[in-house]
Amino acid sequence: KPDPEAVLIV
């Protein structure tokens, strides 16, 4: 699954 920080960028 995607990184938690990556979700914030998205």
UniProtKB/Swiss-Prot annotation:
Q: Which UniProt keywords apply?
A: Cell wall, Secreted
The record's subcellular location field reads: Secreted, Cell wall
Protein name (database record): 46 kDa cell wall protein
Q: What is its main location?
A: secreted
Question: GO cellular-component terms in the record?
Answer: extracellular region
Q: Which organism is it from?
A: Phaseolus vulgaris
Q: Superkingdom of the source?
A: Eukaryota
